[in-house]
Amino acid sequence: VGDLPSDLFSVVGFTLTERLSELFHGCLELASTNPDVGAGEVLEQQVDLVVWQDGVPLRRFTGVVNEFARGDSGHRRTRYELIIQPPLWRLGLMHNSRIFQTQTTDTLVRTLLEERGIANSVFDLKRNPQEREYCVQHRESDLAFIERMAAEEGWHYRYQHGSVDGDEQPGLVLADHHGDAPRLEPAEYNGKAGGSTQQPAVFRFRYEERVRAASVAMKDYTFKNPAYALMHEQSAASANQRQDYQHFDYPGRFKADASGQPFTDAKLDALRNDASTAHGESNRADFTCGAKAVLTEHDNPTLNRDWLLTAVIHTGKQPQAMEEEGGSEPTTYHNTFSAVPADKTWRPKRTHRPLMDGPQIA
């Protein structure tokens, strides 16, 4: 934790939830022989947590402390609890109203991130965003504004915690595709293990399908050519539902065909981002949202395919950290995860724009 001694805290347990296009949230239960650790020494400090197995580092989690709690003291140790989130969390505390003119969305987002000290960000975009003549952040946080713009463009974001060897540093990734997603080792399914196996495996896997919008139509108006039908449509082929479920929207918030079709495609993907999903449990510490892995050895061969992880909840327990107060329970790690077929493009749903009460006087 920050510049504090690395042996000051022992990890009793942790839970960390990460999802695409959401801030991850980690809760660390710690113990220390020092009963006098104060909030001022911990809040806003960088945290580095490494999961080990048999002396081998498996996974690294990094974040910033935004909550601190001191618990009870036992015979020799005092309990503490820390909440960690990515540095991007700070933008949720910064509320503003401003106007951006003649800028592309990636330039706009880069400006906000750099102003707030988020330097390690990567834009992995296949499509060059169109210039926005006029774009307003209105009575909303910097984070809400960035998430709104990203969803409109069809971008998702994820946080890289960094590698255990230090070759890959923590950072924010914004992307409009999953082609460069981290590739994990194949995940072997072992439903009979019931979570008791020490070998890396997926021991629960549930596949689901849902009826969702089958097509999207978006229309807007251009004063340059009022008679022109500025309308774009996109449909999704699905054999398991009716095809007449159309989502129509006006205005589509685009001024030209160059942005109208991508906006329409992105909206359909977002409305269908949970049409085909899977949920499971595993002991694979390397599972991280935004990564891809092939499932193997499942008794249903159609599920032995490539999957994109969209959410992972990591849980670890190490009661021995409390020594004489810890009992005889073993050290454990497991996770629950959500995934979609890797040939689908997962995109976040759009949020509503803030409403303006009336004319604003400059």
Task: Describe these PLM feature segments.
Residues V1-A362:
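Amphipathic alpha-helical and helix-coil boundary elements used as assembly
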